[in-house]
Amino acid sequence: MFDVEAHEVIPRDAEAAAGLAGWDRLDEPRADYREQCFYHRLPAGPDGMAGIAVENPALGIRLRIEYSAGTLPNFVQWKNCLSGGYALGLEPTNASVLGRAADIGNGTARKIQPGESVEFDLIFRFEHRLPVRP
């Protein structure tokens, strides 16, 4: 289960578009599951940080990721509910998952000039609470 402000969610491809309504849920493992990837346009707060949290109430665990939206303007969610290969990727990034050539081609590639420096702020908060029992 995700805890996040309302924001735009953009599917990477037709497979993700078919699963858009369930972007915020992790499905049961399936042998025929095909990975889905979503781009999130998360709003930054007054401090320039954007964030998202994912939690499992049954286990009482929660992860919150906050990042500097100015230097990491993209947030990518990779969802794979394949039996035997179950995984979730939560990735603040300054690039897309389409590759460098695609980013250069569409004008979104970022470059660091000679002598330039860039700061990336990332905060990971891991919390454990008492599990919620049905």
What are these regions (language model features)?
Residues 1-69:
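Active-site/ligand-binding surface loops and adjacent short beta/alpha elements
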Residues 58-134:
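Active-site pocket scaffolds in enzymes
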